[in-house]
């Protein structure tokens, strides 16, 4: 059952006071200092210059920002009319370490925010404030939490500061973003019960973080006028621009294995119903369990502007599809999406993701990897991407070119490393007014200045 929380109408002054008390930034030292915005672009490619601060977004353009925090995944979308959508809030608490697949000493050798105790959501907060100076919109109109993994919504432990608004949650990830900004709506895969495929607040290995997130959302729903909804597959009316001035559509493709069929708003449930779930240990789902792993429950969407299309699928993967065909959630989502211009790599480019079949159907001109450990993306996945899509351009927020953990992954070849178009920074896709073409920029991250390091394009939307 889908539920939408409704609110009584409050007097204007009361609403103003309520929101003011709900979106005050926590008292922390800014990570990104205010910088000059530069000249407004007129849509000409030549106005984006390497070595200068990224030009401000202009009305009619659509921006897709892959914000690098070294702690997970975060995408911020500015629609042509200034409507703002935040997808995830990269804030794991993984320490700098050299333990197998979580090794991150390579990428953090360049920049390690954890040395100063800086949380991912603090970096995101300051980044969003710069973007909001362009748009004049101080509201995050929509937040989508794609799924309940810490590198997407925010880890939690006893060392984190408690929110000044409620003692029921601590500040990191989406809970901190909720405290720092006025927010219109939060969409996720579990509201309001968070009980599929089992009780997510008491059984998974990250139950403490999930409970912290749920407490924050419930507080802001009850006290701050935030709406919370289950992400609904198949529809185009859940995430909508504030105006109808531009042809922008956000199609919700899938959530919890409920996948759009391509026919109207019709969907098909591909995962077992809750009553049919069989899992030995919810804290460690195995390939033989009749239970979907958290990654394949991700919220999946396609954002379209004119001829431009962007596919983002959280941590979609196809692990263990030989045991249960429905555990390949990636391919059916690709089939119903069809061809796109830009794709966020599924599951950071990890193993058992971005299959040749899915890549062939999506056929992106550009793939962006939001990476946060040394083995993102896997060398085999990079090679597969280019073998499947020889002319595709690849961009990676953190790209480790040195030796990778023995027995986990191989070092990226010099030839493949040279093919990566942009890396080690924020990746920004800027779509021109009308959606006919776009450019991709890599901007500085560690200094917070958003200085342009690389510009690719323009690419022509198909």
Regions found by a protein language model. Name each.
Residues 70, 90-92, 149-151, 191-193, ...:
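Catalytic metal-binding/acid-base residues of hydrolase active sites
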Residues 80-85, 91-187, 333-350, 363-368:
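Active-site metal-binding motif and surrounding structural segment of the metallo-beta-lactamase
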Residues 1-11:
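Bacterial N-terminal signal peptides that target proteins for export
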Residues 63-85:
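N-terminal active-site segment of His-dependent metallophosphoesterases
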Residues 23-30:
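Bacterial lipoprotein signal-peptidase II cleavage site
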Residues 31-63, 69-71, 127-130, 136-142, ...:
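Flexible, acidic/histidine-containing loops and adjacent segments that form or flank the divalent-metal
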Residues 18-21:
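C-terminal motif of bacterial Sec signal peptides marking the signal peptidase cleavage site
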């Amino acid at each position: 059952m889908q539920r939408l929380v409704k609110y009584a109408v409050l007097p204007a002054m009361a609403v103003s006071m309520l929101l003011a008390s709900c979106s005050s930034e926590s008292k922390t030292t800014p990570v990104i200092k205010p910088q000059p915005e530069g000249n407004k672009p007129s849509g000409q490619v030549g106005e984006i210059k390497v070595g200068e601060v990224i030009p401000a977004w202009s009305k009619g353009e659509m921006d897709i920002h892959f914000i690098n925090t070294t702690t997970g995944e975060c995408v911020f979308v500015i629609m042509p009319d200034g409507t703002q959508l935040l997808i995830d809030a990269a804030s794991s608490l993984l320490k700098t370490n050299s333990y197998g697949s979580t090794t991150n000493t390579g990428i953090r050798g360049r920049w390690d925010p954890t040395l100063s105790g800086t949380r991912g959501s603090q970096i995101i907060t300051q980044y969003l404030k710069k973007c909001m100076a362009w748009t004049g919109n101080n509201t995050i109109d929509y937040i989508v939490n794609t799924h309940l993994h810490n590198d997407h919504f925010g880890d939690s432990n006893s060392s984190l500061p408690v929110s000044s608004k409620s003692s029921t949650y601590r500040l990191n990830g989406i809970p901190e973003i909720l405290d720092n900004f006025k927010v219109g709506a939060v969409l996720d895969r579990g509201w309001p019960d968070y009980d599929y495929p089992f009780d997510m607040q008491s059984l998974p290995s990250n139950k403490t973080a999930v409970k912290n997130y749920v407490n924050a959302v419930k507080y802001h729903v009850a006290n701050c006028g935030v709406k919370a909804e289950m992400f609904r597959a198949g529809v185009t009316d859940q995430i909508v621009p504030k105006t109808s001035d531009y042809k922008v559509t956000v199609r919700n493709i899938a959530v919890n294995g409920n996948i759009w069929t391509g026919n109207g708003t019709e969907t098909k449930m591909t995962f077992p119903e809750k009553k049919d779930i069989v899992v030995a240990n919810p804290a460690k789902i195995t390939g033989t369990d009749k239970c979907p792993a958290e990654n394949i429950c991700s919220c999946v969407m396609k954002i379209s502007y004119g001829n431009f299309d962007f596919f983002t699928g959280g941590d979609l993967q196809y692990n263990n599809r030989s045991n249960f065909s429905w555990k390949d959630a990636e391919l059916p989502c690709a089939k119903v999406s069809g061809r796109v211009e830009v794709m966020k790599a599924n599951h950071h480019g990890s193993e058992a993701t971005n299959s040749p079949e899915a890549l062939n159907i999506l056929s992106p001109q550009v793939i962006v990897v939001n990476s946060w450990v040394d083995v993102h993306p896997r060398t085999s996945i990079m090679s597969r991407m280019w073998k499947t899509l020889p002319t595709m351009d690849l961009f990676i927020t953190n790209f480790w070119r040195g030796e990778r953990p023995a027995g986990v992954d191989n070092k990226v070849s010099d030839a493949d490393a040279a093919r990566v178009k942009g890396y080690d920074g924020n990746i920004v896709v800027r779509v021109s007014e009308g959606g006919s073409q776009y450019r991709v920029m890599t901007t500085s991250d560690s200094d917070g200045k958003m200085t342009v390091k690389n510009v690719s394009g323009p690419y022509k939307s198909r």
